[in-house]
Amino acid sequence: MQRGKKYKALKEKVDSTKFFNIDQAVELAKSTSYTKFDGTVEIATKVDYKSLQNIRGTISLPHGNGKKVRVLVFCKGDKQNDAKAAGAEFVGDMDLIEKVAGGWTDFDACVATPDMMKDVGKLGPILGRKGLMPKPKAGTVTTDVAKAVNELKSGRVEYRPDKGGVVHLGVGKVSFDNAKLVENIRTVVQTLMRDKPSDAKGDYLKTFSVSPTMGVGVKVDVKELVNTSI
């Protein structure tokens, strides 16, 4: 991809041969952001494990990620009142199932009570393709719909590596205080290390970098980051 003059000028601010501590990396990454909007600060970390399909889970960012999350909840009876009170934008049962079956997916996260999953499961081709299918492991198939909605809206994100073993996550906005971004990043590291498979050998996190939506990626001293986060 052809890079513009602005990117090339900003790239000179970052020594690409150096690995920075997390505080320095966040400061540098933010200083290279050149979007006119409030860009996202993202992390990328490569995990070393033989079965990548087993690496997945959820992370609750203490300061959220700055993203507004529109939540849909499939539930019945009093649970609908609980979901609405927690702030879910869309709440219903068969009426919503029919709407989604028609191709509507104008929401960012989906929760369902266990008794709804027989019907929600039929939406697999639509919800699964967009990564919206409720899952017990992710805490989105639950009887406590209020808790699930609150967690999704307060910054809980799902993670899993791509085919190359790299986990990509947005950890906040460029406008966030550095300390809040650092705390979010340390929470990511703590969760990844906590969820590390018991038979993973050697250094589980091989590389780590921080970058803005549009800007320069900054390499992080991953060993120091892990040692000071857990």
From Swiss-Prot:
Gene Ontology terms, MF aspect: rRNA binding; structural constituent of ribosome; tRNA binding
One Gene Ontology term, aspect cellular component: large ribosomal subunit
Pfam families for this protein: Ribosomal_L1 (PF00687)
Keyword entries, A-Z: Repressor, Ribonucleoprotein, Ribosomal protein, RNA-binding, rRNA-binding, Translation regulation, tRNA-binding
Classification via InterPro entries: Ribosom_uL1_bac-type, Ribosomal_uL1, Ribosomal_uL1-like, Ribosomal_uL1/biogenesis, Ribosomal_uL1_3-a/b-sand, Ribosomal_uL1_CS
Gene3D superfamilies for the chain: 3.30.190.20, 3.40.50.790
Biological processes per GO annotation: regulation of translation; translation
Known role: Binds directly to 23S rRNA. The L1 stalk is quite mobile in the ribosome, and is involved in E site tRNA release.
HAMAP family in alphabetical order: Ribosomal_uL1_B (MF_01318_B)
Quaternary context: Part of the 50S ribosomal subunit.
Family: Belongs to the universal ribosomal protein uL1 family.
Protein name: Large ribosomal subunit protein uL1
Source organism: Leptospira borgpetersenii serovar Hardjo-bovis (strain JB197)
